[in-house]
């Protein structure tokens, strides 16, 4: 392939405007401080644990009794050690799943750990272990409650806010509140008071992210670990309503007709074409949620379905390495521990993540590029076997790069394209499976929304 480096963001910019009023509108959208923190700590572990763990089921019925919760103790310190070994920086615990059983001694229901043989408060034990181990702690609270009698009536919103208040005021710093949109087909048509929930969280835990059915983090659209070719953080604001309102939502006249059906499973969420048809835009990064096992809750029948360390590392590269965050579910067993198979796979995953950056060739903090920097050369001190290139944009100035390439300078002096991609965003990890001996790399920004701003680029062998 004959290189053509003259066509770049400083010249043709992919045939689209580098700067105009629309581009300025796009790049005015930037993350809040808690979203910047998320970009710096993009890998958490989900802990599905509760009544379903005791019964070895995926979904309960709401008809369980407190006697069905037969788990008497947990080892949260082991959970924390396992999560840290994997390279994750936080835990999100299912404090109440759809069955309505509460892992803390809630004052508002008897269907709680306080009326079981379990000794203590599970939420407190886990949150304390996270604090001691230097991990973030987040809470999952299911809006759908199959047990609570007030569900489906306005009184349920009071009940839900009371429980939310308990979780947000008794367990230290909460990094994230995770709202699930799932509910059964035969459930009464009941509208949750989302605005009230959000206001309560902003008041009691102002730094907490509100995820999935919330305004801060969006669902990637599947639970299989798949991401889009171009995963944008700047998207139409309407997308934040898609998960919680579904087809019942009313659309404003300011939204174009083609945007009315936009949802988190669409392939194109943030291209210029999509953004041009949206009146309001938000910073709304994608989260990849996937389980280490076949199911979300532990079951001994699924002990042989644990994903290998190699597969988990591949999921990391495809999520964190593709401008997303990763929420990997690791369900504790009915003995209150992470199963040895899960722990072994997670340890191997963490080793692979750390090994990726153990041997840097060079790293640079670039900042905003200059008008003459259509491409930038990075020269090595000698021939190195390049295995990874890791790039990050300065997201506090929005997401700008729309197309880029990496070209390696081979020992014979010839240039070889080693990667052609679109977005960079929070992080882009380019992996050369077999490695490539080279003297350096040329970064070519082909297309951008205004001047590219590259926070860092690193080359690793």
Where are these regions (language model features)?
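Mature catalytic domains of secreted/periplasmic carbohydrate-active enzymes
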Residues: 2-434, 444-460
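Exposed beta-strand face motif in extracellular beta-rich ectodomains
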Residues: 437-441
């Amino acid at each position: 392939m004959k290189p053509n480096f003259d066509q770049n963001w400083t010249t043709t910019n992919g045939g689209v405007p580098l700067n105009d009023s629309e581009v300025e509108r796009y790049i005015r959208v930037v993350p809040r401080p808690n979203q910047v923190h998320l970009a710096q700590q993009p890998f958490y572990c989900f802990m599905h644990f509760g009544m379903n763990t005791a019964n070895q089921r995926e979904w309960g019925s709401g008809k369980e009794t407190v006697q069905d919760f037969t788990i008497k103790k947990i080892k949260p310190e082991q959970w924390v050690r396992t999560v840290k070994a994997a390279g994750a920086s936080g835990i999100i615990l299912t404090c109440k799943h759809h069955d309505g059983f509460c892992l803390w001694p809630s004052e508002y229901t008897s269907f709680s750990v306080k009326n079981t043989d379990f000794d203590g408060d599970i939420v407190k034990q886990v949150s304390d272990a996270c604090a001691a181990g230097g991990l973030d702690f987040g809470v999952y609270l299911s809006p759908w409650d199959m047990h609570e009698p007030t569900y489906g009536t306005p009184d349920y919103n009071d009940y839900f806010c009371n429980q939310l208040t308990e979780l947000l005021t008794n367990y230290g710093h909460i990094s994230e509140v995770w709202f699930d949109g799932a509910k059964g087909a035969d459930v009464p048509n009941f509208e949750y008071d989302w605005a009230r929930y959000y206001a309560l969280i902003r008041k009691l835990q102002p730094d907490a992210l509100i995820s999935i059915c919330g305004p801060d983090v969006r669902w990637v659209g599947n639970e299989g670990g798949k991401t889009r070719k171009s995963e944008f953080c700047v998207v139409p604001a309407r997308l934040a309503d898609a998960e919680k309102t579904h087809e019942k939502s009313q659309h404003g006249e300011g939204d174009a007709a083609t945007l009315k059906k936009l949802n988190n499973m669409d392939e194109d969420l943030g291209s210029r074409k999509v953004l041009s048809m949206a009146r309001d835009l938000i910073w709304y990064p994608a989260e990849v949620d996937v389980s280490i096992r076949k199911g979300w809750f532990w079951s001994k029948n699924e002990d042989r379905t644990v994903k290998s360390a190699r597969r988990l590392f591949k999921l990391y590269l495809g999520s964190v390495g593709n401008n997303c965050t990763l929420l990997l579910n690791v369900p504790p067993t009915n003995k209150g521990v992470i199963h040895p198979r899960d722990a072994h796979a997670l340890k191997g995953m963490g080793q692979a993540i750390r090994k990726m950056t153990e041997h840097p060739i060079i790293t640079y903090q670039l900042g905003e590029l200059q008008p003459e920097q259509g491409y930038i050369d990075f020269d090595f001190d000698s021939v190195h076997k390049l295995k990874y290139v890791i790039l990050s944009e300065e997201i506090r100035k929005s997401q700008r790069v729309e197309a880029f390439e990496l070209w390696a300078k081979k020992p014979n002096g010839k240039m070889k394209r080693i990667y052609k991609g679109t977005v960079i965003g929070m992080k882009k990890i380019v992996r050369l499976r077999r490695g490539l001996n080279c003297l350096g790399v040329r970064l070519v920004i082909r297309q951008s929304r205004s001047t590219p701003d590259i926070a860092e680029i690193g080359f690793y062998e």
